[in-house]
């Protein structure tokens, strides 16, 4: 289980703004300006406090106009093939900016990989300990530097 989260109130505020933008668009799809304001405020708070947002949240926000991207309502979503790979192309209907996302079932985001978790990084031990440079004569230090650079 994860430990206590730093800036818990800030993450709760970001979550509230994101949910409020979804609520506004679901109740009244014409009120995109208010939803855009909520999303822009969310991005500003996250940037000011240097907080990392989940990639799934960032993918649902337009990078230029801060609109909430909901397929069929505020954006179009198409499947394309390019150079043998499948891509999902989202185009914002407000500013016409498009984003491409790799559509590969085998692809894992870095945050979802096991080696990205802090618990797993602490368990990894180097195969052999590094020598203490203060204990070695200068000739050995130079030869070790040459061996490691090769």
Curated annotation (Swiss-Prot):
A Pfam family that the UniProt record links to this protein: Rpr2
Record-level Gene Ontology MF annotations: metal ion binding; ribonuclease P activity; ribonuclease P RNA binding
Keywords: Acetylation, Metal-binding, Nucleus, tRNA processing, Zinc
InterPro entries in the record: Rpr2/Snm1/Rpp21 (IPR007175)
Residues the record lists as N-acetylalanine modifications: 2
One Gene Ontology CC term in the entry: nucleolus
Biased composition (Polar residues): 140-150
Nucleus keyword on record: yes
Positions of Zn(2+) binding: 62, 65, 92, 95
Transmembrane segments: none
Region listing for Disordered, in residue ranges: 121-150
GO BP, one annotated term: tRNA 5'-leader removal
Cellular localisation: Nucleus, Nucleolus
Role noted for this protein: Component of ribonuclease P, a ribonucleoprotein complex that generates mature tRNA molecules by cleaving their 5'-ends.
Family in the record: Belongs to the eukaryotic/archaeal RNase P protein component 4 family.
Assembly information from the UniProt record: RNase P consists of a catalytic RNA moiety and about 10 protein subunits; POP1, POP4, POP5, POP7, RPP14, RPP21, RPP25, RPP30, RPP38 and RPP40. Within the RNase P complex, POP1, POP7 and RPP25 form the 'finger' subcomplex, POP5, RPP14, RPP40 and homodimeric RPP30 form the 'palm' subcomplex, and RPP21, POP4 and RPP38 form the 'wrist' subcomplex. All subunits of the RNase P complex interact with the catalytic RNA.
Name of the protein described by the UniProt record: Ribonuclease P protein subunit p21
Organism: Mus musculus (Mouse)
Lineage: Eukaryota, Metazoa, Chordata, Craniata, Vertebrata
